[in-house]
């Protein structure tokens, strides 16, 4: 093939036809290789420049470069067109009917027990009570002895308590957290200790594992009046209504005097909701606090019990059966 402008024009014309006939990006790329590649037609023409007279080389080289640029422009334009067509076809194949109804999203919710604990923490947090935590596997000193529960007390018997060995138990209340706090912190103290506790019992109103929140306040001149006022406000806040409340004398080894708190149910009967009392002097002495200087009150409530009363649940075991039909009611 002679190297002249006619030849170059012919190659450009061939390229135009080949580019126009390329139906997809792969075919177009093959056209590029055939004309502009290392072994393409334009490369062969460039090699022929060496055979031309010296004065003709620059002019012919310029002609070839202009032709190559023209072909490259055609390739680029055709490539953009093919890619646009490809995208259009893909969108048409994967089109979305915006008139179809949307798919609902499954939204989770907090477990009712978790909701109750959060509600309790929020109320007492506003009163300056700190949330404290402690071990669920507890030694007998912090679970019993320091709480004025002697070795012969019924609460320490095997049928009520889960023992690992004679000195190690699954805690039966979160009161051990109060002892551990008073061992390392000095009054004034305001704490609550929510957490899991364990007792060997299982029926409609009891499970071997349940949740408890215990509270403690120790300071100078703390009285039973303070305790009654705080618990009275808490119960009205928790149930979001004016509930009738009574304090009934009771006995707990770690408080003196002690009381149980009842509320009037919708059926006209009193329902026990928590226990409380003034911290026993022996408990204060066990942690190095002088009961002649400081006094305090303590209270404890079963979270599941309060949750049952708030939401009208009859069987405590429903909280632990993972039945979504039940749990979805509390979103």
Curated annotation (Swiss-Prot):
It catalyses: tRNA(Phe) + L-phenylalanine + ATP = L-phenylalanyl-tRNA(Phe) + AMP + diphosphate + H(+). One of its GO terms (molecular function) is phenylalanine-tRNA ligase activity. GO terms for cellular component: cytoplasm. It comes from the Bacteria. PROSITE patterns: AA_TRNA_LIGASE_II. It holds the Pfam family tRNA-synt_2d. Mg(2+) binds at residue 256. Its EC number is 6.1.1.20. Its cofactor is Mg(2+). Binds 2 magnesium ions per tetramer. It is an enzyme of class 6 (ligase). Keywords: Aminoacyl-tRNA synthetase, ATP-binding, Cytoplasm, Ligase, Magnesium, Metal-binding, Nucleotide-binding, Protein biosynthesis. GO terms for biological process: phenylalanyl-tRNA aminoacylation. It is found in: Cytoplasm. Tetramer of two alpha and two beta subunits. Belongs to the class-II aminoacyl-tRNA synthetase family. Phe-tRNA synthetase alpha subunit type 1 subfamily. NCBIfam families: pheS (TIGR00468). This is Phenylalanine--tRNA ligase alpha subunit. It comes from Colwellia psychrerythraea (strain 34H / ATCC BAA-681) (Vibrio psychroerythus).
